[in-house]
Amino acid sequence: MNLENVILSPVVTEKSQDLQTIGERMGKRTVKYTFKVHPDANKTLIKQALKQMYNVVPTNVNVAVYRGKMKRFRNMPSQRPHYKKAVVTFADGANLDFAKV
């Protein structure tokens, strides 16, 4: 798999913004960022892709797979796509420029 296709987009939600500042509040110098990643990506590929894109080595990667919800449109059932989300921990308060994604 090409490393440029591993990271799809950053996830910017209230919960992910709270994760970025939780390390400062607990007295640690760690920062957590959340990304939507390719469904076939594993933790090693995610680390390599982030190192290539941002020149920062992550200390920890946690991955979760989300199943698409069943929805109805005009009484016809359809399913939203499945996706994978990665919560990546960086040490020493690393700041990432999301314009590169």
Curated annotation (Swiss-Prot):
Gene Ontology annotations of biological process type: translation
Pfam families reported for this sequence: Ribosomal_L23
Gene Ontology molecular function, alphabetical: rRNA binding; structural constituent of ribosome
HAMAP family attached to this UniProt entry: Ribosomal_uL23_B (MF_01369_B)
Subunit composition and interactions: Part of the 50S ribosomal subunit. Contacts protein L29, and trigger factor when it is bound to the ribosome.
Protein role: One of the early assembly proteins it binds 23S rRNA. One of the proteins that surrounds the polypeptide exit tunnel on the outside of the ribosome. Forms the main docking site for trigger factor binding to the ribosome.
The protein's name in its UniProt record: Large ribosomal subunit protein uL23
Organism expressing this protein natively: Leptospira biflexa serovar Patoc (strain Patoc 1 / ATCC 23582 / Paris)
Gene name of this polypeptide: rplW
